[in-house]
Amino acid sequence: MAQGTLYIVSAPSGAGKSSLIQALLKTQPLYDTQVSVSHTTRAPRPGEVHGEHYFFVNHDEFKTMIGREAFLEHAEVFGNYYGTSRETIEQVLATGVDVFLDIDWQGAQQIREKMPQARSIFILPPSKIELDRRLRGRGQDSEEVIAKRMAQAVAEMSHYAEYDYLIVNDDFDTALSDLKTIIRAERLRMSRQKQRHDALISKLLAD
């Protein structure tokens, strides 16, 4: 069976990364593509399901996993830990399923060190003006928070060149088409096609 591909997807807040990934998944069968499910120490929110939205663990369990080097990457955010399990990712990839990991540039660097075969995609907004409009469109942040998010966005975008692919999300449908094209091209790589069609190739080359 052909090994699945791990896709690292990063973008500044407001670039439309999550919307693009969710739209992509709606066009792909579950046996082809999944989103990575992270471990976290924070409490479940209403409606969240263990194993579907996150793997919820306590701090001691999480620290034990860190000690076992069980994570491809992990970080602390506002007192809670979040991490991507190497075992979970590898088990899914071994079934031939592609996995999407929505993560920032720092987490992406950690994963590249441990899984250099992963493919990475960076998504940019079409302009700072449009990014500002999208951030304001949420209608829930103060001017101070928006200014902070814009500064964080610029810092995040400065790492775009570290990625394999670059998508500019100006028109959503075009950006989604670009994302699909990347996935299709990766699935046609020699290494994957050779595994997928091994029996056929053997028959074609038999004396």
Swiss-Prot record:
Q: Which UniProt keywords apply?
A: ATP-binding, Cytoplasm, Kinase, Nucleotide-binding, Transferase
**Superkingdom, taxonomy of origin:** Bacteria
SUPFAM superfamilies hit by this protein = P-loop containing nucleoside triphosphate hydrolases
Its annotated compartments are:
Cytoplasm
Location, primary (coarse class): cytoplasm
Residues at which ATP binds: A11, P12, S13, G14, A15, G16, K17, S18
List the molecular function annotations (GO) for this entry. Answer: ATP binding; guanylate kinase activity
EC assignment: the record states 2.7.4.8
Q: What class of enzyme is it?
A: transferase
The record's InterPro entries line, in alphabetical order, gives: GK/Ca_channel_bsu (IPR008145), Guanylate_kin-like_dom (IPR008144), Guanylate_kinase (IPR017665), Guanylate_kinase_CS (IPR020590), P-loop_NTPase (IPR027417)
GO cellular-component terms in the record? Answer: cytosol
Q: Which SMART domains does the UniProt entry name for this protein?
A: GuKc
Q: Which reaction does it catalyse?
A: GMP + ATP = GDP + ADP
Annotated Guanylate kinase-like domain residues: 4-184
The similarity annotation says:
Belongs to the guanylate kinase family.
Q: Give the function comment from the record.
A: Essential for recycling GMP and indirectly, cGMP.
Its protein name is: Guanylate kinase
